């Protein structure tokens, strides 16, 4: 691997990516661009080695499956500054660089007496990645607290500021996911309240708070409850390669939900994102099809959580992708429900 160092950025050739994805699969970037100062981005992208080539942005690689070597150039942001840029009577605006660790931002916000992000504690990844997927967990999603996304628009070759409406947030969706080749996120501003109605009615949070003895819970208590639950249910990607939940929970029309419940009375159903819609548990569907805890070679499904695809050691991205496809096909055959992956698949088609 050869390196070229410039002011604000560094370009490396034939860079290994195993340490840059949480599945820990082997892959190689023809070019790896590390940007330390976002203002240097236009100059870096104009470098003759990578000008006009496809770009893959990797934060911590916690929401990708590298099923092959990515084409073109892999881009990583190393800007890791966090600060409060505005105080108001009942909220504050927090700005974080794209390279900031997501969980570190959650802890920072709590230390500043701010709430809103507590249910999103311990999600792996970086701040720059969080708007793309509109990350969500335990009844909360980050789009509800994003004030502005700062990005470089590759179409106009200008830095732009997109407010929440411009971001077109949906369930695990955004304009950044819909137009992955257009925007390069360099920082995010969050609108975080001083006081916030806590979300406690999801996935055992109240029970965990009771175990903690936190009867009068605050935001920090909720964050700790979420951390405890996640550590019990989800494998640490530093120990066992994974990307968290691999499949989205399917959103279906109410009529289809009713037909499924007529055949499968014990099927859990949750409110959808809009009227006339319901949400199924992908984990339940997968477990009912017998995949929870199954292992083939070094590819498998976690025995603790049916949504988590794991690499026990030397599974390739292609092997993990094949395993995931067969899971989805078995669910389709049994329930006529289509599962979609949460991670972005690189080097192959789903």
UniProtKB/Swiss-Prot annotation:
Active-site residues per Swiss-Prot or TrEMBL entry: 172, 245, 342
Pathway: Cell wall biogenesis; peptidoglycan biosynthesis
Record-level Gene Ontology MF annotations: FAD binding; UDP-N-acetylmuramate dehydrogenase activity
Domain FAD-binding PCMH-type intervals: 24-195
Keyword Transmembrane helix among record annotations: no
Protein EC: 1.3.1.98
SUPFAM superfamilies reported in the protein's UniProt record: FAD-binding/transporter-associated domain-like, Uridine diphospho-N-Acetylenolpyruvylglucosamine reductase, MurB, C-terminal domain
Keyword Flavoprotein assigned: yes
GO biological process, one term: peptidoglycan biosynthetic process
Reactions the enzyme catalyzes: UDP-N-acetyl-alpha-D-muramate + NADP(+) = UDP-N-acetyl-3-O-(1-carboxyvinyl)-alpha-D-glucosamine + NADPH + H(+)
Cofactor(s) demanded: FAD
InterPro entries registered for this protein in UniProt: FAD-bd_PCMH, FAD-bd_PCMH-like_sf, FAD-bd_PCMH_sub1, FAD-bd_PCMH_sub2, MurB, MurB_C, MurB_C_sf, Oxid_FAD_bind_N
Location (main, coarse): cytoplasm
Keyword field: Cell cycle, Cell division, Cell shape, Cell wall biogenesis/degradation, Cytoplasm, FAD, Flavoprotein, NADP, Oxidoreductase, Peptidoglycan synthesis
Entry GO terms, CC: cytosol
Pfam family, any one: FAD_binding_4
Cell compartments where the protein resides: Cytoplasm
HAMAP family tied to this protein: MurB
Family classification: Belongs to the MurB family.
Biological role stated in the UniProt entry: Cell wall formation.
Matching PANTHER family: UDP-N-ACETYLENOLPYRUVOYLGLUCOSAMINE REDUCTASE (PTHR21071:SF4)
Protein name: UDP-N-acetylenolpyruvoylglucosamine reductase
Species of origin: Xanthomonas euvesicatoria pv. vesicatoria (strain 85-10) (Xanthomonas campestris pv. vesicatoria)
Taxonomic placement: Bacteria, Pseudomonadati, Pseudomonadota, Gammaproteobacteria, Lysobacterales
Gene name as annotated: murB
């Amino acid at each position: 691997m050869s390196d070229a160092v410039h002011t604000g950025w560094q370009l490396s050739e034939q860079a290994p990516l195993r340490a840059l994805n949480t599945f820990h699969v082997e892959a190689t970037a023809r070019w790896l661009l590390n940007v330390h100062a976002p203002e240097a981005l236009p100059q870096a992208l104009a470098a003759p080695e990578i000008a006009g080539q496809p770009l893959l942005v990797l934060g911590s690689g916690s929401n990708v499956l590298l099923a092959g070597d990515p084409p073109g150039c892999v881009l990583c942001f190393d800007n890791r500054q966090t600060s409060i840029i505005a105080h108001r009577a009942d909220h504050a605006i927090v700005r974080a660089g794209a390279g900031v660790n997501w969980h570190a931002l959650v802890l920072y916000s709590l230390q500043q007496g701010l709430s809103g992000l507590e249910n999103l504690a311990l999600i792996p990844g970086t701040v720059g990645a969080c708007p793309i997927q509109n990350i969500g967990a335990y009844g909360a999603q980050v789009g509800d607290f994003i004030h502005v996304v700062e990005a470089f628009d590759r179409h106009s070759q200008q830095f732009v500021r997109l407010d929440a409406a411009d971001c077109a947030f949906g369930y695990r969706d955004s304009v950044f996911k819909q137009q992955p080749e257009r925007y390069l996120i360099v920082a995010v501003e969050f609108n975080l309240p001083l006081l916030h109605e806590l979300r406690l009615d999801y996935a055992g949070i109240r029970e965990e708070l009771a175990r903690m003895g936190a009867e009068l819970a605050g935001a920090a208590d909720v964050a700790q409850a979420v951390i405890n639950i996640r550590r019990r249910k989800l494998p640490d990607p530093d120990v066992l390669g994974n990307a968290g939940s691999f499949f989205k929970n399917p959103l279906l029309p109410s009529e289809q939900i009713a037909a499924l419940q007529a055949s499968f009375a014990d099927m859990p159903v949750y409110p959808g994102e809009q009227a006339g819609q319901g949400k199924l548990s992908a984990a339940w569907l997968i477990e009912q099809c017998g995949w929870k805890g199954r292992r083939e070679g070094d590819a498998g499904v976690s025995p603790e959580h049916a949504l988590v695809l794991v690499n026990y050691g030397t599974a390739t991205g292609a092997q993990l992708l094949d395993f995931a496809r067969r899971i989805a096909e078995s669910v389709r055959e049994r329930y006529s429900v289509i599962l979609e992956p949460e991670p972005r698949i690189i080097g192959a088609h789903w």
